[in-house]
Amino acid sequence: MSNKLVLVLNCGSSSLKFAIINPVNGEKHLFGQAECLNLPNAQIKWNLNGIQYDTELSSGSTHDEALNFIEKNIYNQQPELLSQLTAIGHRIVHGRDYFTQSVIINDEVIKKIQGSIPFAPLHNPANLIGIYKAKKFFPKLASKNVAVFDTAFHQTMPEQSYLYALPYDLYQKNGIRRYGAHGISHYYVTHEAAKLLNKPVEKINLITCHLGSGGSISAIYHGQCIDTSMGLTPLEGLVMGTRSGDIDPAIIFHMYDILGMSIQQIYTLLTKKSGILGLTGVTSDCRYIEDNYIDKEDARRTINVYCHRLAKYIGAYSTLMDEVLDAVIFTGGIGENAAIVRQLTLSKLTLLGFQIDQNRNFAARFGTSGKITTDNSRPALVIPTNEELVIAQDTARLTA
């Protein structure tokens, strides 16, 4: 076992992922997740050296309480593992345009993360709790905490990509612009794709699709992001589990003026009751629309809208590649496992030279990576993401 390990914390809006990782080889000695935080059915699951554990947390447990449980009940299962920690890495959802790369956390960094809360009101406060607790639990590593931003990879976007057609002073004075999300994942699969395609990352041109409960797509030109689908917040873009993605903004005024809905009701509808959940009326789980695509109208309707939106973005982003599009990459829980989503999406893109290989597509699931198109097709690849490894490696590099 390496004596240089990194603790990675990823505090979501209602979840908390944690892992102790060897940043050199990616081995996870401990990993787990607390789910349904702030809800009656809060629970936590973890794997320590290959052994699986799970337990219920107190009803309504917060991030703070979940971190206390982890410190008291999980870390103490193997104290010698903690003695090998050299640094702590934190996934931070939004850093505005303050950060173009990962940074060691100090008071100024914390202040800027706090200043970004209006752009990620559910996530950044949870991220800050993780930082405060880590410094408290591991005082000897207080100066070895690193922030890795989901927005940083997208800071290479040119002005024509990140500006909205709104009064310019809204950007200058209020920071209203496109920021994107899932940048850590888009960065990882970009570099992995360059290896698989045997091409220097600074010459690779890709369209990367991170498809999970949240979803985003990025145009990668010469290894850098030049456009991405999520905007000021993670609500814009693709159809997602419970988020609408792109809509006509006037729908909001219609719901407010004509339907009499409050601003909070509209916000909840767009973020919690739309997307796959809204279209099916049953569930936000993509496996439902996969399993019932043939037999149920709601599933068929939903997957058709989902894949139409995704294909439309891929087609649009392909026009940004001045030279050649090397490949389309699928990652994230849906991107890595939903063969039917990949098939239906690529079937709409034959004009771009994509031809699905049914056997390869079906085989590339459940952690298996690889090419899913025919030999004479433009390549499409499945690459399982590994955000924790990126965070661990950035953390180790900055604190070495």
From Swiss-Prot:
InterPro entries to which the protein is assigned, alphabetical? Ac/propionate_kinase (IPR004372), Aliphatic_acid_kin_short-chain (IPR000890), Aliphatic_acid_kinase_CS (IPR023865), ATPase_NBD (IPR043129)
Active site positions: D150 (proton donor/acceptor)
Q: In which pathway does it act?
A: Metabolic intermediate biosynthesis; acetyl-CoA biosynthesis; acetyl-CoA from acetate: step 1/2
Keywords attached to this Swiss-Prot or TrEMBL record, sorted alphabetically, are: ATP-binding, Cytoplasm, Kinase, Magnesium, Metal-binding, Nucleotide-binding, Transferase
Which amino acids does the record list as binding substrate?
A: R91
**Which reaction does this enzyme catalyse, per its entry?**
acetate + ATP = acetyl phosphate + ADP
Q: Out of the domains of life, which is the source? A: Bacteria
Q: What is a single cellular component term in the Gene Ontology annotation?
A: cytosol
- Tell me which residues bind Mg(2+): N10, E387
- Family (UniProt): Belongs to the acetokinase family.
Question: What does the subunit section of this Swiss-Prot or TrEMBL entry state?
Answer: Homodimer.
Protein's UniProt name = Acetate kinase
Which organism is this protein's natural source? Baumannia cicadellinicola subsp. Homalodisca coagulata
